[in-house]
Amino acid sequence: NVRRNRLSDFRNVRQNGLIAMKLENGERLIDVQAVREDEDVLLATRKGRAIRFAVADELRVFSGRTSTGVRGIRLGAGDEVISLSVLHHVEALAEERVAYLKAAGAKRRNGEPEESVDDAESVAEITLSPERFAALEAAEEFVLTVTAGGYGKRTSAFEYRVTGRGGQGITGVALTRKNGGAAVASFPVRDGDALMLVTDAGRTIRIPVDDIRIAGRATQGVTLFRIEDDEHVTSVFPVVED
């Protein structure tokens, strides 16, 4: 579940804190983010699902702090939300997004086609003007996804189409035995920054974001951290460079 409140609801915080959201049995709070009307929410799950919806259209402002909120994503059996991220909302038709992803992928690969472009959508093919391509390129964000087996990738946020909240979402990462079978992190990253990955064996590695491959949603990613068979990545966080 998700909910939105005014910051003023937390103006006077008592010494023992305030209730931010009512939780049902077995639930826990995943994250708290400040959002604006011109932004989107991205939820990702352990089983590799993701859903993106607009703050302005899908999240009303609650007047109190003690309700359970509204459904953000419908979880499958044994699944759970692992992250909440905030993305810039970009007005773009489905045909424009698909055309941009194909053109941007070909540009990165020196003319070779993009390996995966929003396979859940069937849209008419169009050609973007140079001006429109440049505008979308300037607005593009990338979402990092990392799995328990130390695999990861960057995916254009344009591959995460905006829908209504409460659905089952779309594939954010293809999970396999090879990549650990579970997603452990999913959030936006910027060029020039770095990542820290930590395992349950206490090992860490730092990786430049620029070195992480850009790939489609329905791919398993590539090796970021070579770990032992009984070892798992448990924590991933960005290191923002000045």
For each of these PLM feature ranges, what is it?
Residues 1-242:
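C-terminal interaction appendages of subunits in large macromolecular complexes
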